[in-house]
Amino acid sequence: MNTQNIYNNKDKDININTNSNTKIKICGLTSPAEARYLNENHVDFAGMVLFFPKSKRNISIEQAKEIMAALDASIKRVAVVVSPSIEQVRQIEASGFDYIQIHGEIPETEAEAAIAIPILKAFNVSDMGSYEKYHNDSRIAGYVFDAIEPGSGKTFDWKLVDNIPRDEKLLLLAGGLNPDNVRMAIEAVHPDGVDISSGVENDDGAGKNPDKIHDFVAAIKS
């Protein structure tokens, strides 16, 4: 899939690397120490959950800025939100994120007040049918396909993604991935990238585990 020039606005073009390597996104970072784990393993995207107190991975904008400051410049910063308000979107835009990953509804704006950073639209197995609603939306840089409960560590039937037409936009597969099943997932779906959170956390669910991150990346690149 050619994923060059997937999002354009009047100020900049965003290009996704089109080499054959599967992109890697580690989501739900909560500390600068975890950012360093990503640096050591040369991942592509770092996700931070904002404005969603129901999540144990929810952090403040100030905490996110500290994490972003610890990330290598090559790692794309992704704000992960659920049906954000336009005021929350504006805070994200002003904080240095490269992408905004939106679960739920995208806020409506007037043309002159358009969202200024690329959007990754997230879908779970219960709303994959709404993909068509966003297929021709020029604001969308890519899609994240997840299980019915994002961040739960549960997988879904990967064959469901076969029904999604492939286009020039980035396709990330999430939902229950871990070092043991990620190769199988890549071979089944052929996504542009994979997205993981709980699968690389400590056994007690508190924080990311550097060994699991290493094993996850190694499984993909082996």
Question: Which residue stretches match the model-derived regions?
Answer:
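Conserved N-terminal beta1-alpha1 strand-loop-helix module at the mouth
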Residues: 1-222
